[in-house]
């Protein structure tokens, strides 16, 4: 399944510190090779408005969110765990 990212995702990505962007790059590369790798904690959170929402760990304090499409995951958000918790609750 091909990953894609929204313009909002890239805007948030560019706002992250360089070390977090580097970690995100490593995690997304790992996801392409092995989406089931335990360090990703890649999981479906549920359905919202008929769309599957998925989460992946970037660091202990950062997460990324995607919507599953037929042939791809569309990554739409990346950021700190506190904001992530608010978004998924």
Provide a role label for each language-model segment.
Residues 30-56:
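A short, surface-exposed loop/turn module that caps and links secondary-structure elements
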Residues 2-7, 11, 15, 57-89:
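Enriched for short, Lys/Arg-rich terminal
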Residues 15-18, 33:
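Secondary-structure boundary motif
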